[in-house]
Amino acid sequence: YPSSSIPSVPAYWGNDYFDDVYIHNGKEQRYKGYCTDVFFREAKRFMLESSNKNQPFLCYLSTNTPHGPFIPKEEDRKYIKKVLQQNKFDHLGENLKRRLSLYLGMIRNIDWNIGKLMRFLDENDLSDNTILIFQTDNGSLMGPQYFNAGMRGKKTEIWEGGHRVPCFIRW
């Protein structure tokens, strides 16, 4: 993408996370599929090409989800919506549940893609020589409204809930 991040506002009319236009090696190109699926698919393609040439690789994969506009894949939204119908989430209210089904639907897709990436590394004998690091860039956007591990604050705020992030390393 032609900047340090993929903006929340579409660069092209009609870019809605599905079948969008991205820049690859300086050329605009339309890709088929959901944005996060496309990014992971292209990353795996790059890793396999590098491996087949016996070249070491560094792949920094930064997704644009979960950021607004919150448009998850329908299967992910429906799954989260069903989970949120459980009694233990009744206190959240319907509007928050609707918003969470979008936000957490995007996170579910990232989780699914991380799992596929780990299987890809295993299946292609790349795991033993690859360090996989997963971390996020900031705390939760929703903050303590639904879950923030008991921390005060949320994204853009100075408290722990805004800047403490998960970090997982697999080697």
Residue ranges of predicted features:
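Active-site-proximal cap/lid insertion segments
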Residues: 1-171
